[in-house]
Amino acid sequence: MRRKLAAGNWKMNGLRAALAEAEAITAAAAADGPEVLLCPPATLLAPMAAQAEGTALQIGGQYCHPAPSGAHTGHVSAPMLRDAGASYVIVGHSERRQDDGERDADVRAQTLAAWQAGLTAIVCVGETEAERDAANTLAIIGGQLAGSIPDTATGANLVVAYEPVWAIGTGRVPSVDQIGEVHDFIRARLEQRFGEGVGRSVRLLYGGSVKPGIAAEIFAVSNVDGALVGGASLKAADFTGIIAALG
């Protein structure tokens, strides 16, 4: 059975004082419950990992450069994330695809780098509002899955997050039928490409304005194994409510 996962993406938010929120979230992370992951900005990764040592809380990065080191000013590599205490890294988030021009090939290279460093990659896919309105959602996501995920995927090194771009930070949420259609499609594509064993073991997260009040309804949808949470993960009261709905 796939273990549920609540992943919090803090994005470019949080100074050292925010470690108090992470400590409060730690109390909701239990070895026999849903897995709980926080992905803080790079400046907080090491202190948050140190604070979480000996607990069930997992720590992750928000991006990694494909190269392990080198003359890449301002970037962070997968080995650096691992060295700082990360066990996961988000790759291909829609904000990086849009703001930084990342393509599927870039996401694929980052995923390989993450695996080589011993990190589990959370590969993000999703359509824009224009693509959904044009009825191209599944075609877009199918292309992203094919282009972004390397051939050596396993249930241990890969998590896929579906994030409808038009729902991120807007308060808009797709219907449960829309979420279910996409998650079932992703599951089928993974099984088709990697076989039933791997395809059924990869966890699928929903990400797009997830809030405590609607979390239970989303988590009841077929093939939704958890959530990639943005703003609601910044406050322990909100994120622990989502974790409780998952557990």
Curated annotation (Swiss-Prot):
It is an enzyme of class 5 (isomerase). PROSITE patterns: TIM_1, TIM_2. It is found in: Cytoplasm. GO terms for biological process: gluconeogenesis; glyceraldehyde-3-phosphate biosynthetic process; glycerol catabolic process; glycolytic process. Its EC number is 5.3.1.1. Substrate binds at N9, W10, K11, G169, S209, G230, G231. Its main location: cytoplasm. GO terms for molecular function: triose-phosphate isomerase activity. It comes from the Bacteria. It catalyses: D-glyceraldehyde 3-phosphate = dihydroxyacetone phosphate. The active site is at H93 (electrophile), E163 (proton acceptor). Pathway: Carbohydrate biosynthesis; gluconeogenesis; Carbohydrate degradation; glycolysis; D-glyceraldehyde 3-phosphate from glycerone phosphate: step 1/1. The keyword Cytoplasm applies. Belongs to the triosephosphate isomerase family. Involved in the gluconeogenesis. Catalyzes stereospecifically the conversion of dihydroxyacetone phosphate (DHAP) to D-glyceraldehyde-3-phosphate (G3P). HAMAP family: TIM_B. NCBIfam families: tim. Homodimer. This is Triosephosphate isomerase. It comes from Dinoroseobacter shibae (strain DSM 16493 / NCIMB 14021 / DFL 12). The gene is tpiA.
